[in-house]
Amino acid sequence: MCSTSVYDLEDIPLEDDDPNSIEFKILAFYARHHVFKNTPAVFSPKLSRTRSLSQKALGTWSTDSWTQVSLPCRGSPSSEKNISLGKKKSSWRTLFRVAEKEEGLPSSPKEIRAQGPQGPFPVERQSGFHNQHWPRSLSSVEQRLESEVVDSKVACIANRVAEIVYSWPPPDVIHSQGGSKLKERVSEILYFRFEGPCDSKNKDGEDQIISKIVELLKFSGDQLGREIKKDKALMSSFQDGLSYSTFKTITDLFLRDVDTRGESEVKARGFKAALAIDAIAKLTAIDNHPMNRMLGFGTKYLREYFSPWVQQNGGWEKILGISHEEVD
C-alpha cells in the first residue's frame, strides 16, 4: 500500500504531539533522510537488518564504535546525500525472536488485545481515502524541513540512529542473494513463516497480520513497502488507517524481539530507542492518516516509553554517544 494522505503538515491539527518537540523533529528528519528513498550503498535496501536464529552473536556494540564515526551534522538537509558511516568496530549482539520477556509488557497480539476493549485493528476514520505514493506524501514534510534551518542537534541524533540501525549484519541466507532473487527470497521467507497469505477477516488473521508487520519492520523501508503493496490482505487491513493502540501493539512487539541480555541498561535502552525511531518512521508507510498524525503517534510513544529515561541519563546525545564537538 505504502500511501498516506496528501494533506499538508499544517492542515491537520495535531493532538498529542508537538511539532516543535525534539522527538517529532527527530522522527521527521529520520523519515525524510533514512527511510523510503534511494539510499547510498551503506543503506542498501537489499539487506535485511535483522538476525536469524542460526546466527551466533558477534560480540557487543562498544561505546567506542558509537563515537569513532563522524557524521555530517551541520548545514542544510542536502548535506545528508553523501553520508558515509564508515566501518563499524563491532556489531550489536541481537538475536531476533529469542527475546527475554520484560516485566509488564504483553508478549503477543492476543495478550495485548486482551488488555483493552478494542480489537487489534481499531481504526480512526478519516473523511476520505487518499492513494498517493510515499515520495509525494512526504513532500509536505520535506517542504517544511527545506524552509527551515536544520537543527544540528536533530541531524546528529537522527544520523546516529541510522548508524546504529544499519550496524546490524544481515542474515547470511539473504546477504548471499542479489537483485530479483533477493526479493523472491524475502517474499518466500515471509510466506512460509506465516503459512500463506494473511487473512484479516478473523481475530487469528488479524494477529497474523500484526505479526507479519512486525517481521517486515526488520527489513529495509523499501522492502517493507514492496511487500505491503503486494499483499492485498495487508493493504485492505490498513485502508482506514492505524489507531494509536494498534500502532503501539506493533511497536511493542517489534522491540520485544530484541535481545539485549548482558548489556548495560544505557546501551540496551539506547539501542531500543534507536530501533523504535526506525520502526516508527517505517510505519508511516502503511497508514492512510496524514503523515504528521503518524509522527504524532511516534512522538507520543517516545515520550511515554523513552524520553523520561533519556533525560534522566543526560539526553539523546549522551545515550547515543554523540560528542559535543559533533553537534557544535
UniProtKB/Swiss-Prot annotation:
Motif (BH3): 213-227
Sorted UniProt keywords: Apoptosis, Cytoplasm, Phosphoprotein
BP GO annotations: apoptotic process; regulation of apoptotic process
GO terms for MF: protein kinase binding
Motif (BH2): 309-316
Similarity field: Belongs to the Bcl-2 family.
GO cellular component: cytosol; intracellular membrane-bounded organelle
Entry keyword annotation includes Cytoplasm: yes
Annotated protein name in UniProt: Apoptosis facilitator Bcl-2-like protein 14
Residues with PTM Phosphoserine: S44
Task of the protein: Plays a role in apoptosis.
Keyword Phosphoprotein: yes
Gene name, Swiss-Prot/TrEMBL: Bcl2l14
Subcellular location: Cytoplasm
Superkingdom to which the source organism belongs: Eukaryota
Alphabetized InterPro entries for the sequence: Bcl-2-like_sf (IPR036834), Bcl2-like (IPR002475)
Post-translational modification: Phosphorylated by MELK, leading to inhibit its pro-apoptotic function.
Gene3D superfamilies membership: Blc2-like (1.10.437.10)
